[in-house]
Amino acid sequence: MATKKKVLLKVIILGDSGVGKTSLMNQYVNKKFSNQYKATIGADFLTKELMVDDRVVTMQIWDTAGQERFQSLGVAFYRGADCCVLCYDVNVAKTFENLDSWRDEFLIQAGPRDPDNFPFVVLGNKIDLENQRVVSQKRAASWCQSKGNIPYFETSAKEAINVEQAFQTIARNAIKLEDGLVFPIPTNIQVIPEPQPAKSGCC
């Protein structure tokens, strides 16, 4: 069986500053977590190679700054994305309420070909602080359903809960978009010869 070509996927993680975007990315790629918070300046990315079904996938994960003053950087980073991850902190209501504006911002800046079917994944992070939770799982799931059944995971970058599973889903959804943009070459092409001019001859 012929090996399928390698796939490069661009994934953008969006959300308010402090929700754990960098920590989720580091936990998934490097299996590391740091309690020291350092705000991302502009944008940064890590890559990870993984197998999805029978193909090798290289995922380029972009972690963008949550501060408003960096949102003007959006167009350059959002364009060409194959999946957008919307991240919030289950213990801070405002970070969940801002998901709408992050989603809208992405669709405006990235300008995907088919915005209604563009793959998003929502991550409710910091579930290790369960006693501080203010956004219920039901409320988040309801929001995701209202936006076209966006896949939803509750995660903990600190405890590595659901991080691997979430990024597997992110990769699968991104591949679906990539596959949809590949236009198959029809096999039933007919070549019609050009008509030859009639030869003049003696009667």
Curated annotation (Swiss-Prot):
Cited Pfam families: Ras
PROSITE patterns per record: RAB (PS51419)
Residues that bind GTP: 15-22, 34-40, 63-67, 125-128, 157-158
Membrane topology summary: Peripheral membrane protein
Gene3D superfamilies: P-loop containing nucleotide triphosphate hydrolases
Compartments in which it is found: Late endosome membrane; Lysosome membrane; Cytoplasmic vesicle, Autophagosome membrane; Lipid droplet
GO-annotated biological processes: endosome to plasma membrane protein transport; hypotonic response; lipid catabolic process; lipophagy; phagocytosis; phagosome-lysosome fusion; positive regulation of macropinocytosis; regulation of phagosome maturation
S-geranylgeranyl cysteine: lipidated positions: C202, C203
MF GO annotations: G protein activity; GTP binding
Matches recorded under SMART domains: RAB, RAN, RAS, RHO
Catalysed reactions, as listed in the record: GTP + H2O = GDP + phosphate + H(+)
Motif (Effector region): 37-45
Record's GO cellular component terms: autophagosome membrane; cytosol; early phagosome; early phagosome membrane; endocytic vesicle; late endosome; late endosome membrane; lipid droplet
Entry-linked InterPro entries: P-loop_NTPase, Small_GTP-bd, Small_GTPase
Residues annotated as signal peptide: none
Main localization of the protein described in the UniProt heading: membrane
Stored NCBIfam families: small_GTP (TIGR00231)
Protein name: Ras-related protein Rab-7a
Organism: Dictyostelium discoideum
Lineage of source species: Eukaryota, Amoebozoa, Evosea, Eumycetozoa, Dictyostelia
